[in-house]
Structures are given as structure tokens and as C-alpha cells.
Amino acid sequence: MNSLQSLCVLCARLNECALDLECLKFCDPVIVLSDMANFKKNGIVILHLYQTFFEGIKEQNLLCASALTVYMQVLLKAMYEQVLLLDAALESFMVDQDRKKYFEKVLCLKRCAEHLSINISLNNGVEFIVQLSTLNDIEQLISKINSVYALLLPQEGLQICGKIIDLLTIMCGACMVAKPESYLETKTCMKCYEELTLTPNQGKSLRKRLHGKFCNHLTEQKAFFNIEKNIETIEKDLGEAILNYGTIQSVVTEIKKIFKQQRSAESLHVSDAEKTLKKYNIFSKVPDVIYSLSEFTYWSKISETIVRNVAITLQQLNSCHTLYKQLQNDVSLYLYGEVSEDFLALSENLLTHDERLYVGSIYVSPSRLIDLVTGLSIKNLEESPIFKRLAEEDEVQHKIKSLLHDIRDPQTTETPGRLNTINCMLQTHNLQQEVLARKKAYFQKVSESGYNRVMACIREQESLINKVVSVNVYGNFIFEALSKIMNGFVLRKMYLDGSIRVDSCTYDEHLYIKNNLMPKKLPLELLPDLSEIMYTLLTGPLSDFHKSAYPLPANISMAYGCDHAEMLPHMKEDLARCIEGTIHPSVWMVCEYNEFFNFSGVTDVNDMQKKMWNFIRELTLSVALYNDVFGKRLKIVRIDEEEDLNGNVVLTFNHESPLLFHTGGGMTKFKDVYSLLYCDLQAQLSRETVDVPEGVSYSVRTPNLLDLVRENEQDESIIPGCLFDE
């Protein structure tokens, strides 16, 4: 078993322990104190695990984070704090015996720490404050950090990620069951947007398509069914001794009787039709009348879906809750000598039967509540004249009955209700009868259309209730996104130390390359590929769709990141125009000497983004033009990409060392694009060797600024004489 597998096993066991620990918060403290020795023993184990693993996992996340290690950091810290809090609360309860104070302390009811104000500082000192209070806020902040990833210093980025992890520790706690107040189910995340991009938009805007969509990524919905029907399991676990105590056996028997389902009677005409159709299969010779019967039976079943039988009523819900509560009290009397008073029991008397419909019950599965709410809605709809009209015998039922009659008694004359074209043509035209028939058909059409719309609304609300009422656990998307962002900042931080050489190029070298490139033009056919390179360099670590197994173009990755970060449309237009590029260097060669990735004097985030786009454009197009002019194959790579850095221009996004280049003597950092290109050109010249006779010295003349002087300009009237070599 390798280290990762061992960590997964440890995480799984910690999750089991965390769930038990979370349940203890809601239990009667008297029951917890009755087994205090076991609580202390498990608490010591948790403290030992925290002291053994926490610091190591924290350091691991600052070197190479993963979703698992980030989650482990959150889980260990939360369990450690929860054990200390429970221990202190139990010590206080032994003194004052006040359950209300105990639960207020354990559940932190008098204070809310699930809010955080983060001060974000960009490269040039531009600061702004972001308020976080839900998982949606955290996910949105991570998306925005992804959008301005290049403008954040790595130390600042890691510090922000550390604060987010601390907030997740408070918000998630020791248990991964999500608190209802910690997320908004109607607010979507980047994964929701990614899923929508896989289907055609049919001309609808992104906001319209996201409207009404429920996010199942930040919190994942877990369906629980038939919790109330587990009475057989409970009966087996209780044992014979407990079942014979008091009224426990009779209560168990009553619970069994509540949810006995009665099979709803199927429509008689459909049942008869199915019995007839069972005689035929794919090898039988099927008469036309049987085919018609099969088709009408199908449509009849479809139409009957509007009548929905709900297998639970409000009375059954309340009866189930009351009986389970009585069973719990009787078992508590047998085991502990008194009725348990847990957190839920303290507020039990404050709820009416109708209010329990919205609050729910720990003894009834959420799916039952959802069925009940939906059933009450449909029952209210049944009282309307529209539904009553639909419940009447329709033409499909009449057709089925007619066909069955023909099959059973083929000698009988045709049923008057069947369609007979010849008779219709011969019959006298009855205008009044036709009007009534058309009117009935119109009412039927309107009724079905209206009902379908009402049912669609009910289904939509049912989805919302299902998300709200059902158990939700924290998804792994937050931890995955956080680990990707952290790894990007970690790789950038590695090249901030002083061990990297500083370039020794001067302004002359900068000007030499720039003057060589300025008169040239970039080949027009290179622009589309260069645009993709620029999008790749600008895209944050989260928008990595261009690196997936089925990669998308880099501009699509950039579009996803911008859209979810809620970048304004005019900014996206400015980005697109900047990336389009041009073949004329005079347009994009705007960076001064040693001023690459310098944002001094810029006080606005939007202006910083535009300046960053211009920097990346100049870098990309300058390297491409340099390759074209000098016949080189230089490539630009990001520091957070898994590629060979040797011989490539490395973009770090760091203000102090935005560019790196590996030469024979090691890695060198640059603040100027053209000095880096000169360094590459000089390295090529030094690698060129010529066979020289022994005893004869040979050296390659270093390019000089005066090489650009024309022959007719070599006089002191234009070029100062001090620049000429003596």
C-alpha cells in the first residue's frame, strides 16, 4: 500500500469518527456522560492523530496540494476543535446541569463565525475587500482569483487560500453533511456552466439557461428512502429483553401497520386490454385490431400519469413521528432510567403538526416529505373542474372498450362508436352534433395543455424542495479548485529566491534586438496560432479545458473562466480585440526597458488587466517575430505547466522575475523581453564553433549597436565620435 492509499484509508476512518462526533453534539449530555470513559479514549486518539498528521499535511499543501490533502487539513482541524469544545461543554454541564446552555455552547448558537472579510492585494498594491459567508461565495472568489491569477503575488495568493481553508474548517465542521445555511441551492458554480456548454444553447443566453438550475457540485444531494420502514432492523437490534419492556413491543407493532401500502386498483379497461395482449408476441400473426388495441393502451397509460397516488398522508407522518418518539423514550427509560432530552426534544413542543411538514422529522425519510408536499399540491388541483373533466372517460378509453368488444364478439355488427368512413359519408350532415364534438375536443385540448403546464410547475418546485429537504454533503469541487490554485502559486513561489541569476544585459542589447525587429512584419498566417498561445498564457489554473483528454480550444477555456468570474461584456470585448494582434510591431512594442510586468501607477483592476493583456501580447508576438527573423524556435511556457523549461522562455507572472531563461550557466531571470532574446542569440553565437589552426586565436565578434549604422552616416555630424572604437 503506497502513501496515497494509506492516506485514503485514514481519511475514510476519520470520516466515520467525524460522523459519530457530529451526532454527539445533538445527544442528551446525560447519555454522553454515562459513557465518558469511551468518549475520553476516542478523544485522545483524535488529539494524537491531529498532532501526528496535521502539520505534515499542512506543509504538504504548501508544496503540492491535492483535493484529498486539503480536505484532510480541514477535517483534522475541525475534529480537534470539536473534541475540545465537547469536552469543555461536558465539564460545564456536570456543574450546572443546564441542557440549554450546553447545547448553546456545543452548537455555537450565540455566535456566528461563518463569515470572513478577506483583504486582497494585487501586484502594485491595489487592495479591495471580499466578504465570504457561504460556499457559493468561496467558489465565486476562487473563480475571480483564477481570472486575476497573474496579478496576484504568490505569497498573497497562498495566504488567501489559507484563509479560505480556515473558513471551510469552521463552515464544514467535523461532519461533511452540509448545513442548510452554508450554501444557496439556486446559485450555480463553474461545473454547472461547464455542463451547459456540452449542449446547444438554442439561442438562449447563459443567464437564461442557468436560471432555475440547481447546483449539485458544491453540495451533493444524497437520497434516503424508507428510513421509517427500517423497524424490522430496529426490532432485531433491540433484542428480546428490551422488546418485552413496557409498551415497546406494542409500539413496534403499531409502527409496522402505518406504512402498509395498498396497491392502487388499475383501470379496468387497461387491465382487460393487457390480458388480451399477453396472448401475442413478436412471433405471432398480429391482426390490425390487436395492433390498434396495443397503441390505444399505450396512450391510455400515458394519459393516466396525471392521476398520482401518494402513499403517505399528513396523518401518517404525524403518527409515525409520535410512535417513534414513544419508542425512543421507552428504550431510553430501559437503558438509562430516564427519558432522554436531546437537542430536538427541547423544541419539540413548539411545533404544530403542520409545521412539522416544513421542519421534517428524524424518523421519516425526506423523500416521504417530498411525496407528501407534491401529493397535497396535486390533491388541491384535483378539486378544479379541469381535472374532473380529464378524469372522465375519454375517447381513448372508449376506443379500447370498442376494440375489446370486437375481439371477444367478432360476429356482432360494428360498434356505433367506431369510425366508419363510408357510413360517415352517407349519413346526413348534422351541424349541431359537429359543433358539440368540436367544442368538446377544444375543451379537452385546452384542459390537457393547462394541466401539463401546472404539472410542469409542480415538478420544478418538487426539484427545489428535494434539494432543500434532502440530505446534502459537501462536494469535492471546492477542494479540487483550491488545490489547483494553490499548486499554481507554489510553483511561482519556487523561483522567487535569490539563487537565480540576474541578467547582465544592458540597454544596448535591449535596443539591438528591438531595432532589428521593429522594421519587420509578422507573417499574417501566424496570427491565429499566436492568439491561441496568448489565451493559453492568460488562462488561470482552473480553466484547463484545453489540457483535458478531449481538449477544447484555449479561447474557449478563457471564455469559460471570464464568464463564470462575471467579467463585464465590454472587458471581454477589449480582451478579444487585444488578442487579435497585428503584424506591425510598432503597435504592440510598447514595453520600456526592464519594465515588463510592471504595473506602477495603475490604480484600477480593469486597467491592470488590460495592461497585463498588452504585456502578454508583446511577449508572444515579439518571440514569434524573433523566431521568424533569426530562424529560431523559441517557445513560451508557463511556470505551472508540466513541460521542459530548458531552452524555453518561462513566464512566471512574478513582478520581480516575470521571465526566466535557462542558459548554459543555469537559470537567469529577466525583466525585459528583448534582453532575454539577446541572451538567446548570444548563446547561439557562443555555441557556434569553427576549426581553428593550433596557435591561432579566434573569436566571434559580439554584435554592437554601431552595426546598424549605414555607411553614409559614419561621420560625427550624426553619430558622436566617442561611440566609434579607436
Swiss-Prot record:
Against InterPro entries, the record matches this protein to: UL28/UL56 (IPR000501)
ZnF region ranges: C3H1-type: 189-217
Q: Which GO terms describe its molecular function?
A: ATP binding; zinc ion binding
The record's annotation in HAMAP family points to: HSV_TRM1 (MF_04014)
Q: Which GO terms describe its cellular component?
A: host cell nucleus
Subunit (UniProt): Associates with TRM2 and TRM3 to form the tripartite terminase complex. Interacts with portal protein.
> What coarse category fits the chief subcellular location reported for this protein?
host cell
Functionally, this protein is described as follows:
Component of the molecular motor that translocates viral genomic DNA in empty capsid during DNA packaging. Forms a tripartite terminase complex together with TRM2 and TRM3 in the host cytoplasm. Once the complex reaches the host nucleus, it interacts with the capsid portal vertex. This portal forms a ring in which genomic DNA is translocated into the capsid. TRM1 carries an endonuclease activity that plays an important role for the cleavage of concatemeric viral DNA into unit length genomes.
The name this protein goes by in its record: Tripartite terminase subunit 1
The similarity comment for this entry is: Belongs to the herpesviridae TRM1 protein family.
Origin organism of this chain? Human herpesvirus 6B (strain Z29) (HHV-6 variant B)
